[in-house]
From Swiss-Prot:
Specifically methylates position 2 of adenine 2503 in 23S rRNA and position 2 of adenine 37 in tRNAs. m2A2503 modification seems to play a crucial role in the proofreading step occurring at the peptidyl transferase center and thus would serve to optimize ribosomal fidelity. It is found in: Cytoplasm. The keyword Ligase does not apply. The active site is at E91 (proton acceptor), C344 (s-methylcysteine intermediate). One of its GO terms (cellular component) is cytoplasm. InterPro entries: Aldolase_TIM (IPR013785), Methyltransferase_A (IPR040072), RlmN_N (IPR048641), RNA_MTrfase_RlmN (IPR027492), rRNA_lsu_MTrfase_RlmN/Cfr (IPR004383), rSAM (IPR007197). The keyword 4Fe-4S applies. Reaction proceeds by a ping-pong mechanism involving intermediate methylation of a conserved cysteine residue. It comes from Polaromonas naphthalenivorans (strain CJ2). This is Dual-specificity RNA methyltransferase RlmN.
Length: 382
C-alpha cells in the first residue's frame, strides 16, 4: 500500500522524503507542487530528479476525495458532497465575495456533540476525518475553482473549520491540516484568516492556543448553563464559566484581539430581552479578566427534527441593539446558500461571517460604541 502525501504537513513530508534517501529540501519542492500547483501526477514535477519521481511513483500517491455531487446556489455559494467511504459523505462549502473567498471545511463525518439546532448533530457521529481528508477539501476546492472561474491566482483567501463535526474532538488530525493551510509553501494563509469553531472543548482550546493559535469562534447560544446544556449538551461537561475562562487564556495567544461568540437565534428559546441582558452581564464580568469579544447572531435554519423555529428579524435586531447599547460589537448574519442546504446549521456550524472589526474592537475597549448601528454582514475575515 502506498502513502497518500496529502496526509502530511511539511515536517511529515520531510521525514517521508528522508526515508526515501532524499534531502529535506526535496519535501519543500514536492509540497509546493501538491498544494500550490495542485499536482497529482509525479511526472508533472519536472524540477524533481527522474529517479525521485520513480521512487515516489512506487511508494506514494496524491489522492483527493471522490466528489458525489456539486450544488451551486443562486448567490454563487457552492456545496460539494465528498465520499469518505463506508456510506459516509461530508460537505464542503465555498462562499464567494467580491474581495474574498471563504471555504467552510468539515472535520468529521457526522458529529457527536448533538446540538439541538444543528442538522448534522441529529445525524449522529460516524468517524473522524484524517488529515488528508481535511486538507483534500481545500486542495480540491482551490484548484477546481481556479479552473471553474478561469483564474490563475489564489481563489480561497479564508478557511473556516465550521462544517460537519467538532474540530477540537479531532485534534490530532486537525493540527497538521492547519499547519498545511498556514505554511508559505502550502496555502500561505495567515492565522487571522483561518478560523476554528468549537462548541467548547475546553482542554483542547488550551492546546490550540499553545500549538497553533488561529482565529477562534465559540458556539455559545445561551447566557446561562441550564439553557445552554439543553441546546449544547457538551456544556454539561464544560460549563460557561470554564469556557469563558479558556477563551480569556486563548486571547493572549490569538492572532486577533477578540473571540467571536456565535449565537443561533431561536424563537422563544434564547432570543428574549432578558437573555440579551444576561449576556451583557456575563461578558462584563469576564471583560474584567481581560476577555474581549464580538457576537455574531445567526438566524436559525429550521429542519423538521429540531422542533425549533427561527426568530423573526425585528426580534433579532432588538436583541442586537441591547448588546450594542452595552458596547458589545454585534453582527447579524445574512444567510447564504440556504437554497442548497449549505447555510449555517444545515451543515454543522457557522460558514460565513468573520468580518474585519479591528477598529471597532479598539473603540469597544474604550467604551465608545453606544451609538453605532447594527451591521448586517455576509463576509469573512479581511
Amino acid at each position: 500500500m502506498t502513502t497518500n502525501l496529502l496526509d502530511f504537513d511539511l515536517e511529515g513530508l520531510a521525514a517521508f522524503c528522508e526515508q526515501l534517501g532524499q534531502k529535506r529540501f526535496r519535501a519543500t519542492q514536492l509540497f509546493r507542487w501538491i498544494h500550490q500547483k495542485g499536482a497529482s501526477d509525479f511526472e508533472q514535477m519536472t524540477d524533481l530528479a527522474k529517479s525521485l519521481r520513480e521512487k515516489l511513483a512506487v511508494s506514494a500517491h496524491i489522492q483527493g476525495l471522490n466528489v458525489v455531487s456539486r450544488h451551486e446556489s443562486a448567490d454563487g455559494t457552492i456545496k460539494w458532497l465528498f465520499d469518505v467511504g463506508a456510506g459516509d459523505v461530508i460537505e464542503t462549502v465555498f462562499i464567494p465575495e467580491t474581495d474574498r473567498g471563504t471555504l467552510c471545511i468539515s472535520s468529521q463525518a457526522g458529529c457527536a456533540v448533538g446540538c439541538r439546532f444543528c442538522s448534522t448533530g441529529h445525524q449522529g457521529f460516524s468517524r473522524n476525518l484524517t488529515t488528508g481528508e481535511i486538507i483534500s477539501q481545500l486542495w480540491f476546492a482551490e484548484h477546481f475553482l481556479r479552473k471553474h472561474l478561469g483564474r490563475n491566482e489564489r481563489v480561497i483567501s479564508n478557511v473556516v473549520m465550521m462544517g460537519m463535526g467538532e474540530p477540537l474532538q479531532n485534534y490530532s488530525q486537525l493540527l497538521p491540516a492547519l499547519k498545511v493551510m498556514l505554511n508559505d509553501h502550502g496555502y500561505g494563509l495567515s492565522r487571522r484568516r483561518v478560523t476554528v469553531s468549537t462548541s467548547g472543548v475546553v482542554p483542547m482550546i488550551d492546546r490550540l492556543a499553545k500549538d497553533c493559535p488561529v482565529a477562534l469562534a465559540v458556539s455559545l447560544h445561551a447566557p446561562q448553563d441550564a439553557l445552554r446544556s439543553n441546546l449544547v449538551p457538551l456544556n454539561k461537561k464544560y460549563p460557561i464559566a470554564e469556557l469563558l475562562e479558556a477563551c480569556t487564556r486563548y486571547q493572549s495567544a490569538a492572532p486577533r484581539d477578540f473571540i467571536t461568540f456565535e449565537y443561533c437565534m431561536l424563537d422563544g428559546v434564547n432570543d428574549q430581552p432578558e437573555h440579551a441582558r444576561q449576556l451583557v452581564a456575563l461578558m462584563k464580568t469576564h471583560a474584567a479578566n481581560g476577555l474581549s469579544c464580538k457576537f455574531n447572531l445567526i438566524p436559525f435554519n429550521p429542519f423538521p427534527a429540531s422542533g425549533l423555529l427561527r426568530s423573526d428579524m425585528p426580534q433579532v435586531m432588538a436583541f442586537a441593539k441591547i448588546l450594542m447599547d452595552a458596547g458589545i460589537i454585534t453582527t447579524v448574519r445574512k444567510t447564504r446558500g440556504d437554497d442548497i442546504d449549505a447555510a449555517c446549521g444545515q451543515l454543522a456550524g457557522d460558514v460565513q461571517d468573520r468580518t474585519s472589526v479591528d477598529q471597532r474592537m479598539a473603540a469597544q475597549r474604550q467604551g465608545m460604541l453606544g451609538g453605532i448601528k447594527v451591521v448586517v454582514v455576509n463576509g469573512d475575515t479581511a
